[in-house]
UniProtKB/Swiss-Prot annotation:
This is BICD family-like cargo adapter 2. Residues 1-22, 473-489 have a biased composition (Low complexity). Keywords: Coiled coil. Interacts with RAB13. It comes from the Eukaryota. Residues 135-149 have a biased composition (Basic and acidic residues). GO terms for cellular component: cytoplasm. Residues 64-300, 353-458 form a coiled coil. Belongs to the BICDR family. Signal peptide: none annotated. Residues 1-27, 132-152, 300-351, 470-491 are annotated as: Disordered.
Length: 508
């Protein structure tokens, strides 16, 4: 891949422009070797150039090592962040499970307390009934004793005539006791009216609780709809992943084509290198007074063979036996590597970190809704506890039965709510797992895309080197006739002009 700030492509003899030696920033060694190549500079300066080149290569290697180290540190940091996020998620899940377990234990304890209280109330009712039976038996015994006393009084009327005043006093006392009993009956009637009002208030509270239950059911339905929406978003994420995989396959096919073209270019380069070595051997065997025209014809013939070998990479190049003007007029502009290897046209709109943040926000919203539902459930439990305390103070059996039925209904509702909360938590966990899988897949795709970009850069660099080699060969062929034959050399070893092609082949 290339960027707008990447290396420019200077125009050479093959593209209809000036000589490649005019681009001082792209190939600095051309200016450094111009004098030695043309035979005008002294020879001892070449070791210094080689030392500078070696230092530059060492600097490049150090920079590459530092870059690799930075990439490894960045990978390690991302891995640590992922581990911390997973640990936080596990800790939050354990805390939620522990709170749910504590709520269940509290509910079971409250149910056991209510059952124990109901058993105590039943025991109190049985004790009161026993006391009432004892009082009735005592009243019957007192009635029998009164009848016996009356019989004794009738039999002993004469004897008890002196006690008539005492009997009248006793009658007055009994009258007062009767009035007290009547007052107690009226108080019991008032208490019954109060009980009826309390029952009506409890019925109203029961209706209010039913309305709250309906509200909770509506909230649960809303949660289910949100879960369905989350599943829809997850489905869209899967579709995006499938699209990315399809694009990755297309990019891999393009990469294979580019690699095949690069292999052909390398094979052509090797053939050209062998041809240059052959020409070098021939030049060693030839006489030093060979004319410049014969040497130019041989070099043109070798370049013609190299162009025929690289026909697949540059189909628009013409034979090098033509003059520079003819090449400028006839050779078409070579297609740059950016047109051959296009970058991926579509990228994901959001990075994996942003998608993770969005999913964490959704999970936090779900947790807030669950906490609100738990708070409402706690308030309902408190209201039920208050109702239990109020009903525990009532003695009639009907109130007790109604309290037991309300208790059972409230317990059933609490169990249903706990089951629904468990289902919501399970769905949330499944969504979080799907989210983690999607993030891992996206990270893998991103790494593959980066590797593909690196491969493309390598292929583009190879194509640029091959193109630069052809331009330099053409410039060398055009500048050769103006110099004497003994000063021209294609040697790959040490010498006044042997380092140019050797450095070029060493770079490729």
């Amino acid at each position: 891949m290339s960027s707008p700030d990447g290396p420019s492509f200077p125009s050479g003899p093959l593209s209809g422009g000036a000589s490649p030696s005019g681009d001082e920033g792209f190939f600095p060694f051309v200016l450094e070797r111009r004098d030695s190549f043309l035979g005008g500079g002294p020879g001892p300066e070449e070791p210094e150039d080689l030392a500078l080149q070696l230092q530059q290569k060492e600097k490049d290697l150090l920079l590459a090592a530092e870059l690799g180290k930075m990439l490894l540190e960045r990978n390690e940091e991302l891995r640590r962040q992922l581990e911390t996020l997973s640990a936080q998620h596990l800790e939050r899940e354990e805390r939620l499970q522990q709170e749910n377990h504590e709520l269940r234990r509290g509910l079971a304890a409250r149910g056991a307390e209510w059952e124990a209280r109901a058993v105590e109330l039943e025991g109190d009712v049985e004790a009161l009934r026993a006391q009432l039976g004892e009082q009735r038996s005592e009243q019957q015994d007192s009635g029998r004793e009164r009848a016996r006393a009356l019989s004794e009084l009738s039999e002993q009327n004469l004897r008890l005539s002196q006690q008539l005043a005492q009997a009248s006093q006793t009658e007055q006392e009994l009258q007062r006791e009767l009035d007290a009993l009547r007052g107690q009956c009226q108080a019991q009637a008032l208490a019954g009216a109060e009980l009826r009002t309390r029952l009506e208030s409890l019925q109203g509270e029961n209706q209010m609780l039913q309305s709250r239950r309906q509200d909770l059911e509506a909230q649960i339905r809303g949660l289910r709809e949100e879960v369905e929406k989350g599943e829809g978003r997850l489905q869209t994420t899967h579709e995006e992943l499938l699209l990315l995989r399809r694009e990755r396959r297309e990019h891999s096919l393009e990469l294979e084509r580019a690699r095949s073209e690069a292999g052909e270019a390398l094979s052509a380069l090797r053939r050209l290198q062998r041809r240059v070595s052959e020409l070098e051997e021939e030049s060693r065997l030839q006489d030093a007074d060979v004319s410049a025209a014969s040497l130019q014809s041989e070099l043109a013939h070798s370049l013609d063979d190299g162009d025929q070998g690289q026909g697949a990479d540059a189909p628009g190049d013409t034979p090098t036996t033509r003059s520079p003007k003819t090449r400028k007029a006839s050779s078409p502009q070579p297609s740059p590597p950016e047109e051959i290897l296009e970058p991926p046209k579509k990228r994901t709109s959001l990075s994996p970190a942003e998608i993770l943040e969005e999913k964490e926000v959704e999970v936090a919203k779900l947790q807030d809704e669950i906490s609100l539902q738990q708070a409402e459930l706690q308030s309902l439990r408190e209201e039920l506890q208050r109702q239990k305390e109020l009903r525990a103070q009532e003695d009639p059996g009907e109130a007790l039965h109604s309290a037991l039925s309300d208790r059972d209904e409230a317990v059933n509702k609490a169990l249903e709510l706990s089951l629904q909360l468990n289902r919501v938590s399970l769905e949330r966990d499944s969504l979080s797992r799907e989210l983690l899988r999607a993030i891992r897949q996206k990270v893998a795709l991103t790494q593959e895309l980066e590797a593909w970009q690196d491969d493309m850069q390598v292929v583009i660099g190879q194509q640029l080197r091959s193109q630069r080699q052809k331009e330099l060969s053409a410039s060398a062929s055009s500048s050769t006739p103006r110099r004497a034959a003994p000063r021209f050399s294609l040697r790959l070893g040490p010498g006044p002009a042997g380092g140019f092609l050797s450095n070029l082949f060493r770079r490729t």
